Amino acid sequence: MNYPVIETDRLKLRLLTIEDREAVFRHFSEEEVTRYMDIPPCRDISEADEIIQFHIDDSGCRWGVFDKQQDQLAGTCGYHCWTTGPEGKAEIGFDLSRDFWGRGLMTEALLPVIAFGYEEMGLEVIEATVDPGNDRSLRLLTALGFCRDEELVDNLVYFYMRRNQFAG
């Protein structure tokens, strides 16, 4: 599948490449970025290369979220665990550097990414799993219209949104 560059008023989303290694290293070196992820903070530039290569090789996609004003990587977002077919679904993931928190940037990034998932990828359901301590992500998914399943799955909170629930 061809993943487009997505532009919003303040952001440019594009697939990460090896040329982004320094920015990816800085971003994923922040302990607050990786706190609720299943990876430790990057300690070596080669770990940034591995993150980029994982997203290039994976069956999903990961956009770098670039702040247009500062021309800087603010975070990443995208899909993984993608299945096709009549009940096509994928898990959405996202992260944002602390310097960009509280400005509504991830909401701005995810709205067109969700629309792309339904319109171009043919998804019927978009899922997310969140650590119950990650209040910002819990609030973001709720604000975007995801339904929260109160049962914890593997000690994570499960969210989902069906195509017909998206008000984007």
Predicted regions and their residues:
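Acyl-donor (CoA/ACP) binding surface of acyl/acetyltransferases
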Residues: 1-36, 62, 66-168
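Conserved GNAT-fold acetyl-CoA-binding loop/helix
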Residues: 32-53
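A short helix-loop-beta-strand connector motif used in the catalytic cores of GNAT acetyltransferases and
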Residues: 52-66
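Juxtamembrane helix-loop transition sites at the ends of transmembrane segments
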Residues: 47, 53-56, 125, 160
